[in-house]
Amino acid sequence: MCALWRSCIYNCRDCAIKGKETGNIRRRLGPQIPHIKSCAPSSILFSSCSKIEKILTFAAMEIVVSGIRSTGNLHLGNYYGAIQNFVKMQHEYNCFFFIADLHSLTTHPTPASLHTNVKSVLIEYLAAGIDPEKATIYVQSDVPEIAELYLYLNMNAYLGELERSTSFKDKVRANPENVNAGLLTYPVLMAADILIHKATKVPVGKDQEQHLEMARTFGNRFNRLYNNEYFPEPYAFNFSNSLVKIPGLDGKGKMGKSEGEGNAIFLGDAPEVIRKKVMRAVTDSGPTVENQQKPDEIQNLFDLMKVVSTQDTYDHFNNLYNTCQVRYGDLKKQLAEDMIIATAPIRDRINAIAADTSYLSKVAKMGAEKARESASRTIKDVREIIGFRSF
């Protein structure tokens, strides 16, 4: 009998593996270990110790959680700022990547647009390289345990700290007629997204770091209130130094779905659409002094070129700018063609995946089951800790 068999982490009526010689692996790895029964059929567990080793290795991985709001199609900012790193993370971590449709409700989408946007993000996750066999991809609303934990955490989240959230204040200023409770408690729902899987690593941008700090606060507050060190502390994690901020084409800030169609290059944009958007990008009359500082709208174009073009191409146009010889029309044409080339593989996969509705349904169902397996363990524990117990 092999060592893995002797140190089986479970010895219960639900598992295929039985025996008296249970080891200390579960105590060492704690609640991060998924239930083996749901990971592999009993025939595999009895016939292949290498499969057991694979399951235990997966269980020992640190947990990563992140998601993107389903408010429209994904763009270059989403890809280079987040998804590109998601694809790398899935090979080394136990990753949960979700489609944040509950978060999108603060903007009151129609039922039709809500469903369409969720489907689009799912398609684009897959087309961009997230593998449902390596990472758990799920729709937030398919995991009701998240909303339940959100409720419990809300009981210990206070008005003052929620009102001090920078993103809440920004939303109030931008849209004062739509100051709803969902906006106010957005950080609590984000905390529930993270804590439901007991994640320790969360890929976030600078604009979300305050929310992540609040998630730590809510988790630690729960632990103190019930005198139980249950929730681990989650921290920002972006896998490598390759995380970049992608500027929009309007020259006013980062690329975003809410900034208008002309601001963003979407992953599924057709070549002619990309060319039209880039050619409309804001520019000035050109440099008049050698090596002068680039204004924001011009720097944005060069920042985009740094991401999608070759180093030689970037250096060529940068030199033309520094010597006052740049022609913005030529720069934009080159940038557009490089964007078309960069997005071509993803665009092709988007079209192929979108046509396979049975595959999409299978991925969504499988992801929901895997996410709920993790979430239900947490909620069961949380109910017990709070005091919701059967008679």
Name what the model sees in each region:
Residues 2, 8, 12-15, 39, ...:
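Cysteine-centered motifs
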Residues 20-21, 32, 51-54:
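Charged/polar low-complexity intrinsically disordered segments
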Residues 62-192, 347, 351:
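N-terminal Rossmann-like or analogous alpha/beta NTP/dinucleotide-binding catalytic cores
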Residues 78, 210, 216-391:
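Conserved nucleotide- and phosphate/pyrophosphate-binding catalytic cores
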Residues 170-226, 247:
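Internal, conserved structured core segments that host functional sites
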